[in-house]
């Protein structure tokens, strides 16, 4: 897995490297040369390097000099005379590059910038680094617009200019790069929100042999998975299995208003490999729900005249859960006294449990929108997986009016939940543009899914898959956050396959379900044989 560090922790690693004998000037030299090497491997012939006035700009000057030494036609665009740079190190490397023969275009107009870019095949963005946040100022806002209007490929250094490497948010114009060469470690902002579209392919340049050790000691905020990491949690089907040994799933949910959500969740659980799936819904919707499910039995539960579960359903739900390997509660269930009672009863049982959608909203009501004040509810021996999107997560931790808006905040809120009881088998699958599967010991980030997943019902499908994989592990996953990440990865690839069939805009949640099995085969195959996995998964 690849570590993800907050910006402050990256700075601490840099301090550790200097104490280990790697000077700041040497780090800048290595960073610039690492970028130059990536540019050379792209086959660049004519390169324009945009340099800012800080150390990120210094990396650009080093890169330009390295490219010139390899015979590349290179030019630097700088806001001021290199001799006027205030930072000693940036000024020194800029002066060195100029002495070596790197031409510099100082304080150009928009027209001059556009003219310079006309014949360039590659642009290197070194305007604003990881310390940037807020609004981009002139001239960099103009330069960013020029870069984004160019047909040349774009390589960003550390972070695309205009993007916060910590939050992943861009308040104004932001460079849209084809590749980002980031130093030392991945940062949260590169992986989520605006960073998803801005960074392109991300390459990590470690800069020193001591980096790996120092990064681990810095306690990464999260870990980004590679396919081979899933080997420990993949449950390979065998010819000796029967439907019972493959695990059984109970899905509880639905209402007269939302009968479709539990249907999708139950079908997804079956497609994800569970040997037996049972769907429990309000009595009033059993006939129409059963008509959509040939392979999945439907059980009726007590409900009111509006087709919402009543408190009397709780006892029956727990009894059903005791006979299944894992239970999912929530899809389409509504928020009322009866559903709240069902969620409460299941939390107090020993059933391996996935809580999604209105199950989470019932949990928020049960805990008065502050789950951290009710540790007894999540303190259980059996696994508990919560799958909130950002708004649902906000409701759980007292931030209903101020839900998390970034991966950074998402991780903080999820940790508030999992640390509530001091340690248990709980995992929060915090869903967003970048999903994090947060356990007590670590947060695991799967490869993010495609834009096609942004459709109603996609979360119901994921929840059904979560329950299915938990059931196949018989509620005893050795690494529950990693298992949850595997499910997210399969879900994402199912979205990719669906988009190939229907187009990104045309995918509906039901299209994902019938591709779950194929997606799982591909992901699991490449987990065992990771070579070339990136070409397909």
Feature locations, PLM:
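A short, aliphatic-rich alpha-helical micro-motif
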Residues: 117-121, 147, 174, 321-322, ...
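Short strand->helix junction
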Residues: 83, 129-134, 164, 170, ...
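Nucleotide and nucleotide-moiety/phosphate-recognizing core
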Residues: 37-127, 133-157, 341-342
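Short acidic loop-to-helix transition motifs that present clustered carboxylates
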Residues: 108-112, 161-165, 188, 360-362
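Small-residue (G/A/S/T)-rich helix-start motifs and N-terminal tracts that mark the onset
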Residues: 1-79, 86, 190-357, 361-386, ...
